Amino acid sequence: MISNLTVIDPRAKIGANVEIGPFTTIAGDVEIGEGTWIGSNVTIMDGALLRGPIALCDGAVVKMGAKIYGGTTVGVKCTVGGEIKNSILQGYSNKAHDGYLGNSVIGAWCNLGADTNCSNMKNTMGEIKVWNYKAKDFINSRQQFCGVFMGDYTKTAISTKLNSGTSIGLGCNIFQADFPSKYVSSFSWGEEKFELEGLHRMNQRMKVLKGEEYTVEERKALEDNYESEL
C-alpha cells in the first residue's frame, strides 16, 4: 500500500508489493525494487537504486545515487549513501557517503566517515574468523561473507578500512591510516582510551543534529559500561 500523503516524482519506478508511509518524498530517477517497505517521513533523493526487499524506517534519508541491495534494514532517522548490501543499521546512524558496507550490523548513533569501506570477504574466499567475547579469542564463523559488527556510538574517520569479520565495541573513535585490529575494545580512541566526558560531548552534538535528547539513562548506561571496561 502506498499512502496518498506521499510525494513521488513521476519518473520514479516503483516495483510490486512496495509499501510507502505518509509524508515520504521520492525524487526522480529512483528505482525501488519489489518487496520494499518504506516508513513515514522518509526522503529518497535523485538516482537512488533500491533492490528489494529492503526496509527504510521512519525518517530515514537515502542520498543521491545510493545503491542499496536486498536484505538491508535502515533504522529510524538514519542517513545512508554509497553502496550497502545485506546489512542492518540501527536507529540514528549515518553512512551518508561513498564507500561499501556489506554483511554488517551497525549499532545506533554510529557515524561512518566518507569513503569508509568494509570488507565482507577474504581474498582467499575462505571462511572468516570473528571475535568471541566469551572465549576472548577469534573463532571460525563458518561464513564466507561477514563484514563488521559495530557497537553503539562508534565513529569512523574518512577513508577508514575495516577488515572482514571486524568487531568494534561501544563508543569508539576509529581513525587509523591502516586497518584497525579485527577486535577493537569498547571506548577506544585510536590506540588509546576514549575520555568519558569527551564521549558525552560528542554524543550530545550528534543528538542535536538528529533532533533528539541525550537522556540521563543513556549517559548512565554508557558510564556503567565504561567502568566495566577499566
Which residues does each predicted region cover?
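Glycine-rich hexapeptide-repeat left-handed beta-helix
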Residues: 34, 39-40, 46, 61-66, ...
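Extended, small-residue-rich solenoid/repeat segments and analogous flexible loops
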Residues: 1-37, 41-53, 58
